[in-house]
UniProtKB/Swiss-Prot annotation:
Keywords: DNA-directed RNA polymerase, Nucleotidyltransferase, Transcription, Transferase. GO terms for biological process: DNA-templated transcription; regulation of DNA-templated transcription. One of its GO terms (molecular function) is DNA-directed RNA polymerase activity. Residues 14-83 form the HTH HARE-type domain. The gene is rpoE. Disulfide bonds: none annotated. It comes from Streptococcus equi subsp. zooepidemicus (strain H70). This is Probable DNA-directed RNA polymerase subunit delta.
Length: 188
């Protein structure tokens, strides 16, 4: 493969990002690439060994994400941001997300590495409530609605308990006028 953009430049001095941009520009808008295919073409162009590519791969992926000229198109496909208008980018991202919503999600079974086949051991991760897809039906839901009749019966029961302690006959009647006279005497 030959890239005209780098004519006259030393191939060993080129970065993987520069080569990726040139490869995508040469292929054009209708030919977005999977990440693995892009890395393979970069490796072939730069003539790097598998070990060198494996070492540089995390750095390249980080650069690909942070460089503003690349855009992820979903399903691990990449393209150049200059290929898409701003409105078109949002639409493509939204349509990719909408397509994923229709697929049912499968629950993966967790394996506890520490269980080691011991049948008597208790697996505490098995009772995690966040793992359950339990939805309570509306008929199962009970509400604590206050009933005014309950309040009346509570007051009556409270009164009856008080009467057991102090019978009503023992209550002393208080005349409010007497208290007022006593207050007047104290003021003088």
């Amino acid at each position: 493969m030959k890239l005209d953009v780098f004519a006259g430049q030393e191939i060993s001095e080129l970065s993987m990002i520069e080569v990726a941009r040139a490869i995508l520009e040469e292929r054009g808008r209708d030919n977005d690439m999977y990440f693995s295919d892009l890395v393979n073409e970069i490796q072939n162009y730069l003539g790097k060994s598998d070990a060198d590519i494996r070492y540089a791969l995390p750095f390249f992926y980080t650069d690909l994400n942070t460089d503003g000229s690349f855009i992820p198109l979903g399903e691990n496909k990449w393209g150049l941001r200059s290929w898409y208008a701003i409105d078109e980018i949002d639409e493509e991202i939204i349509t990719l997300e909408d397509e994923e919503d229709g697929a049912p999600k499968r629950k993966k079974k967790r394996v506890n590495a520490f269980m080691d086949g011991d049948e008597d051991a208790i697996d505490y991760s098995a009772d995690d409530p966040e793992d359950e897809d339990f939805v309570r039906e509306s008929s199962d839901i009970e509400y604590d609605e206050e009933d005014p009749d309950d309040e009346k019966s509570e007051v009556e029961s409270y009164d009856s308990e008080l009467n057991e302690i102090i019978p009503e006959d023992d209550f002393e009647e208080v005349d409010l006028n007497e208290e007022d006279e006593e207050d007047e005497d104290e003021e003088e």
